[in-house]
Amino acid sequence: MLSFLNLNKDSKPFAKIAGGKFKGKKAYVNEESDKGKNELVVPEGKFVPYPNPMYREVIYIAGQSGSGKSTYAAQYIYHYKKLFPKNKVFVFSRLKMAEILVSLGCIEIPIDDELQDMDAIRDIKDALCLFDDIDTIKEKHLRNTVYDIQNDILETGRHNNIYIIVTSHLINGNDKKNTRTILNEAHKVTFFPKSGAYGITYFLKNYIGLPKKQIDNVLEIKSRWITINKGYPLFIFYENGAKTL
């Protein structure tokens, strides 16, 4: 169930209100209790994503250029750094690192042949890794090398407490094998309704198992972004609220 109160030790924060008189108030999900509500409404301000402080997370963010992927990722990273100020944040991207990520103290990893010597599980611990649109890396051998690093962290990174954010232009991706790995491992998936309903509908139907009516209800939500929590309880949250599915 969902709540604006930290009801017990099993309650996990998933969002925080930015702006307005309720600024800083957190929203929680409790997997072990029926206390709480099926729906939360943000009375003033907007929800921003908040990391699970208890367990590492895999976050998948899919949307077109300009949709808000970088802003969403930066909000998550900002709160991650607040929770774990000693932990490093590494960025794998074909493009020059965005200024907002520079300001957060993120470390850019060059995409070059030296990556072949990297063993992510050996070299990285207690950190967050952002893989930013790596499917757009033009050199196939480099793209495959980065995919290998990403998949190592996706599948075994929990042992080293490595949080991971993966962004992509397409929710179902061009590389079906790697996309399937991401979608299977992700704890939360964020999409942007204005980026196109077809791919989102396919994901909600085939990966989440929602019926058409429920999918239509999700797509009608007035929010720039929507995040679905794949665990129990299954729920979504968005700029002005959250609800169980």
Curated annotation (Swiss-Prot):
SUPFAM superfamilies: P-loop containing nucleoside triphosphate hydrolases. InterPro entries: P-loop_NTPase (IPR027417). This is Uncharacterized protein V3. It comes from Sputnik virophage.
